[in-house]
């Protein structure tokens, strides 16, 4: 099996080596690990990161034999903002203008979200100690440097729970989120989990 992993970075330029210690343990168990380097928010706004993740999945499917991966057992995973990109790689279905590997699809067998920054529908404040809505926030920059407090439609566009309904085709999902997270509000994962259970 292959895990296409999206390194969290607040959608800024990634340090794609920062989780190699953890990922190497999965590799020791027989997983092929592919780490995605996406266009960061300083280059391209949402949904570029999710589209780049989709193209990475397609690349691994096409080159599965070369990397000794099973193209029928692909998973997408990510931590923090990478969890957001992993989720949206499966929520976005139309990316033909930026699909650079049309001979393969971007569907996976499962999504793994580790403390994913899945929503910006929550107000700033505890337990998160960060700014999530102002133009210079990671989320504001991800949407092109806008003040998200005045753009609820953009907040909905970028929030997982606002893009899921009973007809949304999603693979099985595994979510992790610590209750003492001070960067990404753990209530976000709870809301998404409850919505997924509902549907």
Language model: regions and residue ranges:
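Alpha/beta-hydrolase superfamily serine-hydrolase fold, recognizing
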Residues: 1-199
């Amino acid at each position: 099996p292959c895990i296409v992993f999206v390194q969290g970075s607040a959608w800024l330029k990634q340090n794609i080596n920062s989780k190699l210690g953890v990922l190497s343990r999965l590799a020791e168990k027989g997983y092929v690990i592919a780490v995605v380097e996406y266009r960061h928010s300083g280059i391209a706004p949402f949904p570029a990161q999710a589209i780049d993740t989709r193209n990475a999945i397609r690349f691994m499917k096409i080159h599965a034999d070369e990397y000794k991966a099973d193209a029928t057992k692909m998973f997408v995973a990510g931590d923090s903002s990478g969890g957001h990109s992993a989720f949206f790689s499966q929520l976005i279905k139309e990316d033909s203008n930026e699909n650079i590997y049309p001979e393969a699809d971007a569907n996976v067998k499962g999504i793994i979200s580790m403390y994913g920054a899945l929503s910006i529908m929550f107000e700033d404040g505890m337990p998160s100690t960060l700014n999530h809505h102002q133009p210079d926030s990671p989320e504001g920059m991800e949407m092109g440097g806008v003040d998200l407090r005045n753009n609820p439609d953009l907040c909905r566009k970028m929030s997982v729970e606002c893009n899921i309904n009973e007809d949304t085709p999603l693979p099985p999902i595994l979510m992790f989120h610590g209750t003492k997270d001070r960067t990404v509000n753990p209530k976000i994962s709870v809301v998404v989990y409850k919505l997924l259970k509902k549907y």
